[in-house]
Curated annotation (Swiss-Prot):
Pfam families: TFIIE_alpha. The winged helix domain is involved in binding to DNA in the preinitiation complex. The keyword Protein biosynthesis does not apply. This is Transcription factor E. HAMAP family: TFE_arch. GO terms for biological process: regulation of DNA-templated transcription; transcription initiation at RNA polymerase II promoter. Belongs to the TFE family. Residues 6-89 form the HTH TFE/IIEalpha-type domain. The keyword Repeat does not apply. Transcription factor that plays a role in the activation of archaeal genes transcribed by RNA polymerase. Facilitates transcription initiation by enhancing TATA-box recognition by TATA-box-binding protein (Tbp), and transcription factor B (Tfb) and RNA polymerase recruitment. Not absolutely required for transcription in vitro, but particularly important in cases where Tbp or Tfb function is not optimal. It dynamically alters the nucleic acid-binding properties of RNA polymerases by stabilizing the initiation complex and destabilizing elongation complexes. It comes from the Archaea.
Length: 173
């Protein structure tokens, strides 16, 4: 499997936390050392609220930062935004570690055995199946035992890949 371009991975993450507007704003921010909200709005042709919403989402994940300067003419503040390139990789690594811990907790709760309905495909843990008297609550078919849990296998694969990514990124930081 070919390795993804780091910028594409970053933009994929930005898209997942801030949507397409977030990607547009982030790409534009990458072009400047810093830029005001007003300039961003004009450059991108977006509504000020949409730009601001995207910026706040990006800020929540430590991808961008801001500072303000008082406008001498009218006393209002002008907010300037920038990509904090120095802490960007550390923040992304921190997010990956948090996701990894959540996935590991989820993996611990997954059971090796599960029950499924052969008619409609719903899946149940042992406790859930027992609660339904081993009968599908949707269609009434008897539930069957499956020895290997595909969700658990998928989680194990994702956890392993994420651990490898984190290890690699820690070695280069």
């Amino acid at each position: 499997m070919a390795k993804k371009d780091p910028l594409e991975e970053l933009l994929e993450f930005v898209r997942s936390v801030a949507g397409e507007d977030g990607v547009r704003v982030f790409k534009e921010l990458m072009r400047y050392e810093d830029i005001s909200e007003e300039q961003l709005t004009e450059t991108l042709g977006m509504k000020p609220n949409d730009v601001r919403r995207a910026l706040y989402k990006l800020e929540r994940y430590g991808l961008v930062r801001n500072y303000k300067i008082r406008n001498e003419n009218d006393g209002t503040y002008i907010y300037y935004w920038y990509v904090d390139r120095e802490t960007l990789n550390r923040n992304l690594l921190k997010i990956k570690k948090s996701v990894l811990e959540k996935l590991k907790r989820r993996l611990e709760s997954e059971e090796d055995q599960y029950f499924y309905c052969p008619a409609c495909g719903l899946q149940f843990s042992y406790e859930e199946a027992m609660g339904y008297d081993f009968t599908c609550p949707r269609c009434g078919e008897p539930l069957e035992l499956a020895e290997s849990n595909p969700r658990k296998k998928l989680l194990e694969k994702i956890v392993k890949r994420l651990e490898e990514e984190i290890k690699h990124e820690e070695s280069v930081l």
